[in-house]
């Protein structure tokens, strides 16, 4: 069985207050002067002080083999801030740090270790505030208002490094080869790791490590680095430095899931909901010129316009990609929402998913068998549900303590206002009718025959995404739904958490003393007119799930207050994020894919045309990470997700899976 929790570091603090690993019998940093050793070995060994001012790109990427206490990262971050202060006009604007850690420290141990370096406190406090829960995979932390990105990969580096997406190939400007000493932790120091370091290193990229072990030097040379010895720090006689002086060939094992970015930095986004808003911010942070075209007279009038939406992960014991995406997507969403400098109604009150019948009880039992971190999800017995939710249900379930609700409409509007302050241009009442290539650009034709030309286009227009010739064959479908707005009652006012059953019910929003209950589900429908049947069904589902709960019967839908919207979904419940695939070319190029995988060309796509769609009913959870993934892809930067999970988000995935099995593919 796959486990979804990472074992924390087993450590103690010695007489000097230095953390020591019990498993590896080694210190995390020098008892003498760990901070100065880091500056000498890793910053000095990679010549970063001299390289930063001359770096020809806006982003500098550093990768590290063992995060530990984060000393190397914090020291580098401090040095980067000092560089930016001294060279505000330099080409280099942002720092991206990628690190791997098999046994992450707890937040408490991290804070205790950081007390060693009071001069690093301003940076350490930001790291501690965003420290992720122990879930496997990549955790992206956006620090210093996005100027510093930290990708923490939790798990065994020799397993993780083989799962990385090709977006990391030849991207690393400097390697920090760190970790417990080779004699203490030989399993990490492998030729597999050295080869991967060479594959990820940019031509001209460097490495530094504290060790001078002969097998390490020879292994790095075999991988392709030119190595040399340097005087070690303090009492250590020697250390190693290296440079990647060649350009290594980069074979691709799954070209059908290749992701291509763009060399351009000007884009039009088609949409007006949470996907468009968060993508705009992510691209602006990377220096893009962004224009948004919204078909409506205001933002968030589509599926993102609800008063309250629940935030919690979608989990399934039988779908590893779905678990990885939604669990890490959920934690990223919480970090992003907490860091946004905008106001929106929300309450991280927790979400409890109840086993109201035999099928739902079985589903919850399967989720709980996955060894999830308690910070993510925990079992709750029937007699404890009332204590944490405030209402009686007579059901057991699973609770997500960091979940809650937020107002999607307010979030979307205010994020777009923030993006406008950063340079976003918005045009309302622009209904896109057609897009076509013209002189290496996209010609957009809107209702009323208005036209505009843009270098790059992203389609983030919800259920309307398949209205164009380039997207008409996509396997997505519409789902119409109605959310009821109900006034609170003395009984309903006791509800302290979001309840999920065969529907959902939110606690009251103090701003309007109303709850949201929903939602009806009509696959294939785009109906947005109020339905009295849907209104009554929303109420009846609650009563049917909790027939003995008197509070449920106080729900009043008679005022006919509701909101109707249309979602875009896929049959595998995952979003579609990436290049818009060329359906006709895919069928031609991959006609014999099942027999000729080794001859496959890169996935056929439309140049500089991207999509961000099919968020279904979990857009609040998935949109933040999807926006970050797509912005990174478009900008040709490291993507915060492993290759197999990224493949599960690829818009061509449903076609390719069939073609790989030699099965026929149909449009839609």
UniProtKB/Swiss-Prot annotation:
GO biological process: methylation; tRNA wobble uridine modification
Spans annotated as FAD-dependent cmnm(5)s(2)U34 oxidoreductase: 270-668
Subcellular location as annotated: Cytoplasm
Cofactor requirements of the protein: FAD
Primary residence: cytoplasm
Gene3D superfamilies in the record: D-Amino Acid Oxidase, subunit A, domain 2 (3.30.9.10), FAD/NAD(P)-binding domain (3.50.50.60), Vaccinia Virus protein VP39 (3.40.50.150)
Protein EC: 2.1.1.61, 1.5.-.-
Coiled coil: none
Record keywords: Cytoplasm, FAD, Flavoprotein, Methyltransferase, Multifunctional enzyme, Oxidoreductase, S-adenosyl-L-methionine, Transferase, tRNA processing
Protein's name in the database: tRNA 5-methylaminomethyl-2-thiouridine biosynthesis bifunctional protein MnmC
Organism field: Escherichia coli O157:H7
């Amino acid at each position: 069985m796959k486990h979804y929790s990472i074992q924390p570091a087993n450590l103690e603090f010695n007489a000097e207050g230095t953390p020591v690993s019990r498993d590896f019998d080694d210190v995390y940093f020098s008892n003498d002067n760990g901070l100065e050793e880091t500056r000498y070995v890793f910053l000095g060994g990679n010549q970063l002080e001299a390289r930063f001012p001359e770096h020809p790109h806006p982003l500098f990427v550093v990768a590290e083999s063992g995060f530990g206490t984060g000393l190397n990262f914090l020291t580098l971050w401090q040095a980067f801030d000092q560089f930016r202060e001294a060279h505000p006009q330099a080409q280099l604007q942002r720092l991206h740090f990628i690190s791997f850690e098999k046994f992450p420290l707890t937040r408490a141990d991290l804070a205790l270790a950081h007390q060693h370096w009071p001069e690093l406190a301003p940076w350490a406090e930001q790291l501690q505030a965003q420290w992720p829960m122990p879930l496997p995979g990549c955790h992206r932390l956006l620090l210093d208002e996005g100027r510093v990105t930290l990708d923490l990969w939790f798990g065994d580096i020799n397993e993780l490094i083989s799962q990385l997406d090709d977006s990391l190939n030849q991207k690393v400007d400097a390697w920090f080869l760190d970790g417990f000493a080779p004699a203490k932790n030989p399993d990490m120091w492998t030729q597999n790791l050295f080869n991967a370091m060479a594959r990820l290193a940019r031509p001209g990229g460097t490495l530094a490590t504290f060790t001078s072990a002969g097998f390490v030097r020879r292994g790095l040379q075999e991988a392709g680095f030119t190595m040399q010895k340097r005087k070690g720090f303090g009492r250590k006689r020697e250390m190693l430095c290296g440079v990647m002086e060649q350009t290594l060939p980069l074979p691709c094992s799954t070209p059908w899931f290749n992701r291509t970015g763009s060399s351009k930095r000007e884009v039009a986004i088609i949409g007006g909901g949470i996907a468009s808003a968060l993508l705009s911010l992510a691209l602006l942070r990377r220096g893009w010129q962004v224009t948004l075209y919204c078909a409506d007279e205001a933002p968030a009038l589509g599926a993102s316009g609800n008063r309250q939406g629940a935030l919690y992960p979608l989990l399934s014991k039988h779908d590893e990609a779905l678990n990885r995406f939604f669990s890490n997507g959920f934690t990223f969403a919480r970090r992003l929402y907490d860091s946004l400098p905008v106001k929106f109604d929300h309450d991280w009150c927790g979400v409890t998913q109840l086993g109201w019948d035999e099928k739902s009880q079985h589903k919850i039992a399967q989720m709980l068998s996955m060894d999830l971190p308690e910070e993510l999800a925990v079992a709750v017995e029937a007699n404890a549900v009332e204590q944490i939710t405030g209402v009686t249900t007579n059901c057991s379930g699973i609770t997500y303590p960091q979940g809650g609700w937020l107002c999607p409409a307010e979030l979307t509007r205010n994020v777009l206002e923030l993006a406008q302050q950063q340079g976003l241009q918005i045009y309302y009442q622009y209904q896109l009718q057609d897009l076509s290539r013209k002189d290496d650009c996209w010609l957009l034709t809107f209702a009323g025959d208005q036209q505009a030309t843009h270098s790059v286009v992203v389609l983030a227009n919800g259920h309307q995404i398949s209205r164009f010739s380039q997207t008409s064959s996509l396997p997505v479908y519409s789902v119409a739904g109605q959310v009821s707005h109900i006034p609170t009652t003395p009984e309903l006012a006791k509800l302290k958490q979001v309840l999920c059953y065969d529907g959902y019910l939110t606690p009251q929003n103090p701003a309007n003393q109303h709850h949201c209950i929903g939602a009806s589900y009509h696959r294939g429908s785009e109906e947005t007119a109020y339905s009295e049947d849907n209104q009554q069904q929303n109420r009846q589902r609650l009563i049917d799930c909790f027939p003995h709960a008197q509070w449920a019967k106080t729900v009043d839908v008679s005022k006919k207050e509701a909101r109707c919207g249309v979602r875009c979904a896929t049959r595998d419940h995952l979003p579609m994020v990436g290049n818009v695939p060329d359906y006709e070319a895919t069928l031609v190029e991959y006609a014999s894919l099942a027999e000729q995988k080794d001859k496959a060309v890169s996935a056929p796509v439309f140049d500089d045309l991207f999509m961000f769609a099919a968020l279904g009913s979990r857009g609040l959870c998935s949109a933040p990470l999807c926006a970050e993934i797509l912005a990174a892809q478009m900008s040709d930067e490291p993507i915060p997700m492993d290759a197999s999970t990224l493949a599960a988000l690829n818009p061509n995935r449903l076609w390719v899976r069939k073609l790989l099995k030699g099965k026929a593919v149909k449009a839609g």
